[in-house]
């Protein structure tokens, strides 16, 4: 299971989401978390149809299971993580 986090170091919403992500990921140690520094015109972000930052894409076996755009609470992140965590 993998969490792709598309964002930018200069994005205020991205910085605000960091404590929420850290809290939610604490219970899911088997999930790989990959931060992707995105920018206008970057092909990887476009291939995942990312329009706003942060966008979290939750993958299991290479397939998108869930997506959150600008998450603002730990519960929504934890719920999406539970959907991809094979340990649960």
Q: What are the roles of these predicted feature ranges?
A:
Residues 1-9:
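Short active-site neighborhood of thiol/selenol oxidoreductases, capturing the structured segment around
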Residues 6, 25, 29-43:
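Thiol-based oxidoreductase modules, predominantly thioredoxin-like and allied folds used
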Residues 11-14, 56:
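The canonical Cys-X-X-Cys-His
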Residues 12-13, 40-43, 75:
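Short alpha-helical
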Residues 13-27:
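Typically the conserved alpha-helix immediately C-terminal to a functionally engaged Cys/Sec
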Residues 47-51:
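A short glycine-leucine-enriched loop at secondary-structure breakpoints
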Residues 52, 57-88:
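Non-catalytic, surface beta->alpha helical segment in thiol-disulfide oxidoreductase systems
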